[in-house]
């Protein structure tokens, strides 16, 4: 089994001048990555609290991650796009001794020691540092949104990270020394899917920043220059990129493998991608942050596309057990499961339990099994009750997306006095209806919905949008869409 820190030491010996991480013109070789990590680990070696790693897509953020694991304290990644109040809440909860600031933004240190990249660049020592991290130590803590408004810090052990990385290395069909693309900010655990499998196989990690996401031409230039082999992103980010007409195998011959996680992979998106890249390996994966990124996978083939709609998320990875509670809630058990939420025993006890002496996580996701494959069918908390009828918003969204003229869809419940009074369907259209007026298109959409679902589930209003906003993590921003509609 590959050990991440050991793999990096081996890579430094075998490929010292190979580029490990690249962001625009900023690059770090494997030698530089290891040496800077040793210097930072030496600086923080006596701390018992996690290292805050702050910035946006700087290669030095990964230096901070590796250094923190070598020092045995682990890290908490924070992106500069996060609101200041949220950052301060997280820092207060973690109470770190050190903050590694890789950006030009200033942070309120509140008496804590701030280390910046300049500190490492001007340190002329040669430092040999023997890694202190043990399997049971926390490798990283990633904060996710909490239903109470206070973010939850998900703690992942080093052994869980190594197990996940080895599974990804086994899934990867195209071997070592590849060019990987990472779309997700480091504060989102999808980035873990790119960082460690790439570095464990002596690849080069190419980082996509906010500017590239907002200007597809810059992304196109990066894809062409870096000759990307492995793509890791949310499905929503891929949907946006498929608007680039030359995103196809004929133009990007090097692009051979895709990994998707973080959201449901829509059937239409997968079908279009497979048409554009017929010889590529396309993986649909599923997993919550609380279970170390992803716990299932399936290779999307033409046969899978033809047989299943919606698409399955596949089979559980080795060492992980999946089961269903009575209400169809998916339960994940195994070494992948988080240690719990940092300094939050109450919320940890609500969702982390021992089943047959195995640590288990109650996901809040509804699931089903068909043909030995797992399907995610919605969220327990996406159920609403309208006029006495209980319904799944995601089921309505699924049927909206099956309509030819609909490219993407979100269903927004409208509340009055804490009660749902109506549903509104918000859709982005394909370019198939130029000759029809808005009311005709709305009528056609509702007529098609009537073929698939009861009248009471059909949204009262259909609202058109040019495009949907994405969160900083590259997912559909449901909250922003709802606020825009209800404003």
From Swiss-Prot:
Example GO molecular function:
ATP binding
EC class: ligase
Annotated ATP binding lies at 144-145, 284-289, 365, 475
* Annotated compartments: Cytoplasm
Q: What is its EC number?
A: 6.2.1.54
Q: What does this protein do?
A: Catalyzes the first step in the D-alanylation of lipoteichoic acid (LTA), the activation of D-alanine and its transfer onto the D-alanyl carrier protein (Dcp) DltC. In an ATP-dependent two-step reaction, forms a high energy D-alanyl-AMP intermediate, followed by transfer of the D-alanyl residue as a thiol ester to the phosphopantheinyl prosthetic group of the Dcp. D-alanylation of LTA plays an important role in modulating the properties of the cell wall in Gram-positive bacteria, influencing the net charge of the cell wall.
Name-wise, this protein is D-alanine--D-alanyl carrier protein ligase
């Amino acid at each position: 089994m590959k050990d991440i820190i050991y793999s990096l030491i081996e890579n430094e010996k075998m490929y010292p001048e190979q580029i490990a991480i690249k962001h625009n013109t900023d690059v770090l070789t494997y030698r530089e990555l290891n040496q800077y990590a040793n210097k930072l680990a030496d600086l923080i070696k006596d701390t018992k609290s996690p290292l805050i790693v702050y910035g946006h897509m700087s290669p030095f953020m990964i230096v901070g991650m590796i250094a923190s694991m070598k020092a045995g304290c682990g890290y908490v990644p924070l992106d500069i796009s996060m609101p200041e109040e949220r950052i301060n809440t997280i820092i207060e909860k973690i109470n770190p001794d050190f903050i590694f600031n890789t950006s030009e933004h200033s942070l309120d240190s509140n008496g804590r020691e701030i280390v910046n990249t300049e500190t490492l660049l001007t340190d002329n020592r040669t430092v040999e540092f023997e890694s202190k991290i043990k399997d049971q130590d926390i490798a990283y803590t990633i904060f996710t949104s909490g239903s109470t408004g206070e973010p939850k810090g998900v703690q992942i052990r080093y052994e869980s990270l190594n197990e996940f990385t080895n599974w990804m290395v086994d899934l990867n069909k195209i071997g070592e020394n590849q060019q990987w693309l990472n779309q997700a900010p480091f504060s989102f655990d999808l980035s873990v899917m790119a960082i460690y499998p790439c570095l464990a196989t002596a690849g080069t990690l190419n980082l996509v920043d906010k500017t590239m996401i907002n200007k597809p031409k810059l992304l196109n230039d990066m894809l062409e220059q870096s000759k990307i082999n492995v793509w890791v992103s949310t499905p929503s980010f891929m949907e946006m990129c498929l608007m680039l007409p030359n995103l196809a195998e004929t133009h990007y011959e090097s692009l051979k493998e895709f990994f998707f996680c973080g959201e449901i992979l829509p059937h239409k998106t997968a079908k279009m991608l497979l048409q554009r890249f017929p010889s590529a390996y396309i993986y649909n994966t599923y997993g919550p942050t609380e279970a170390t990124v992803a716990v299932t996978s399936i290779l999307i083939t033409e046969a899978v596309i033809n047989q299943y709609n919606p698409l399955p998320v596949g089979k559980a990875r080795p060492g992980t057990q999946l089961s269903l509670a009575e209400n169809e809630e998916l339960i994940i058990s195994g070494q992948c499961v988080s240690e719990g939420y940092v300094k939050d025993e109450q919320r940890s006890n609500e969702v982390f339990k021992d089943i047959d002496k195995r640590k288990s996580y109650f996901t809040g996701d509804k699931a089903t099994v068909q043909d030995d494959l797992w399907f995610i069918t919605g969220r327990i908390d996406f159920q609403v009750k309208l006029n006495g009828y209980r319904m799944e918003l995601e089921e309505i969204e699924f049927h909206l997306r099956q309509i030819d003229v609909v490219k993407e869809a979100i269903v927004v419940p409208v509340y009055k006095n804490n009660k749902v009074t109506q549903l509104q369907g918000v859709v982005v259209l394909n370019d198939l209806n130029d000759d029809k007026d808005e009311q005709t298109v709305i009528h056609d959409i509702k007529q098609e919905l009537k073929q698939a679902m009861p009248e009471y589930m059909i949204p009262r209003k259909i609202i058109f949008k040019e495009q949907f906003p994405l969160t900083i993590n590259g997912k559909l921003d449901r909250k922003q869409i709802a606020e825009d509609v209800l404003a």
